[in-house]
């Protein structure tokens, strides 16, 4: 994982945590939690690719691993839709920029997870 992606995650999480979206702050906190979870999952998948010795243990747990991967892709799709929705309804330029960058980051992370998972299959 490159350092730009790490700093992008940290930057977006910090900016999202500063936003005050009124009654939807619980939803925003949920999005932040999912972003953090997604980052950890992506990082662990990347580490597994780097240590190909883990490939054997992953294959032994293949059913569970595939189910978890599928769940993560569902989370990514939900987050993408949620971020797109927020982009449509917000008029604040700071929020628009933050959500645009979050959307771009989600698409990058989805691609990275796909790449890692294909290497592990």
UniProtKB/Swiss-Prot annotation:
<comment type="similarity">
    <text>Belongs to the influenza viruses NEP family.</text>
</comment>
<dbReference type="InterPro" id="IPR000968">
    <property type="entry name" value="Flu_NS2"/>
</dbReference>
<dbReference type="GO" id="GO:0044423">
    <property type="term" value="C:virion component"/>
</dbReference>
<feature type="short sequence motif" description="Nuclear export signal">
    <location>
        <begin position="85"/>
        <end position="94"/>
    </location>
</feature>
<feature type="short sequence motif" description="Nuclear export signal">
    <location>
        <begin position="12"/>
        <end position="21"/>
    </location>
</feature>
<keyword id="KW-0945">Host-virus interaction</keyword>
<comment type="function">
    <text>Mediates the nuclear export of encapsidated genomic RNAs (ribonucleoproteins, RNPs). Acts as an adapter between viral RNPs complexes and the nuclear export machinery of the cell. Possesses no intrinsic RNA-binding activity, but includes a C-terminal M1-binding domain. This domain is believed to allow recognition of RNPs bound to the protein M1.</text>
</comment>
<dbReference type="GO" id="GO:0039675">
    <property type="term" value="P:exit of virus from host cell nucleus through nuclear pore"/>
</dbReference>
<comment type="subunit">
    <text>Interacts with protein M1. May interact with host nucleoporin RAB/HRB and exportin XPO1/CRM1.</text>
</comment>
<dbReference type="Pfam" id="PF00601">
    <property type="entry name" value="Flu_NS2"/>
</dbReference>
<keyword id="KW-0813">Transport</keyword>
<dbReference type="GO" id="GO:0042025">
    <property type="term" value="C:host cell nucleus"/>
</dbReference>
<keyword id="KW-0946">Virion</keyword>
<keyword id="KW-1048">Host nucleus</keyword>
<protein>
    <recommendedName>
        <fullName>Nuclear export protein</fullName>
    </recommendedName>
</protein>
């Amino acid at each position: 994982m490159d350092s730009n992606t790490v700093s992008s995650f940290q930057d977006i999480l910090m900016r999202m945590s500063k936003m005050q979206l009124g009654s939807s702050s619980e939803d925003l906190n949920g999005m932040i939690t999912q972003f953090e979870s997604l980052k950890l999952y992506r990082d662990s998948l990347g580490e597994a690719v780097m240590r190909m010795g883990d490939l054997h243990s992953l294959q032994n747990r293949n059913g569970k691993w595939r189910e978890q991967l599928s769940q993560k892709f569902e989370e990514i799709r939900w987050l993408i839709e949620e971020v797109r929705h927020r982009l449509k309804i917000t008029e604040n330029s700071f929020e628009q920029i933050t959500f645009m960058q979050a959307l771009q980051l989600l698409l990058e992370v989805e691609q990275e997870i796909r790449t890692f998972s294909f290497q592990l299959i």
